[in-house]
Amino acid sequence: TYYNIAVSHARTTMKNHFRADYSCYHVIDYDTITGQVLKKNTHQGLAHESAWARGQAWALYGYTMCYRETKLPEFLEQAKKVEQYLFTHKNMPEDLIPYWDFDAPGIPNEPRDASAATVIASALYELSQYDRKNSERYKKNADRIVENLTNSYRTTLNKDNGFLLLHSTGTKPTNVEVDVPIVYADYYFIEALLRKDKLEKTGKLF
């Protein structure tokens, strides 16, 4: 079934995409016949062994979603471990808006990635529903991200071609979409705001 394929895919990704510290690679090349891992890559980050910020954000969001759809504890644990990696990292900025790569050599003088922050915030609001022990911490950090994006990363009304947020980074190694508005940053920003509003009004998301 499609469900079984999705669960198998998520488990294979857990096995092969993640390092011992729960940071993740961007792309894994597999042998299409044997399924053997051929190469572990990070195309949009600094280097293959670096922690590309948006990739880490997708990992948090993705495994939170996997738990929602399956209720399998292994996926919740994976999401929690990715969250711990992110929020204990020495290069996570005070305002919780990540640099484009956690291993970028010029930190603190590196571009931020607001899009990574929006994905993290939205994921944290959902994760707070599944891990009651750490729920308040997740919501507090999500609130901080949303507040800082609103106060310091928001565009000016009727400018910037209708975008909401500035300072996202698409692909820094090739200097494509560096320190610019990006549509998916706005999408996840709106999703995070809607989730924040629903939690405050009803105490639940779903």
Spell out what each predicted region is.
Residues 1-206:
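Glycan-recognition and catalytic cores of secretory/periplasmic carbohydrate-active enzymes
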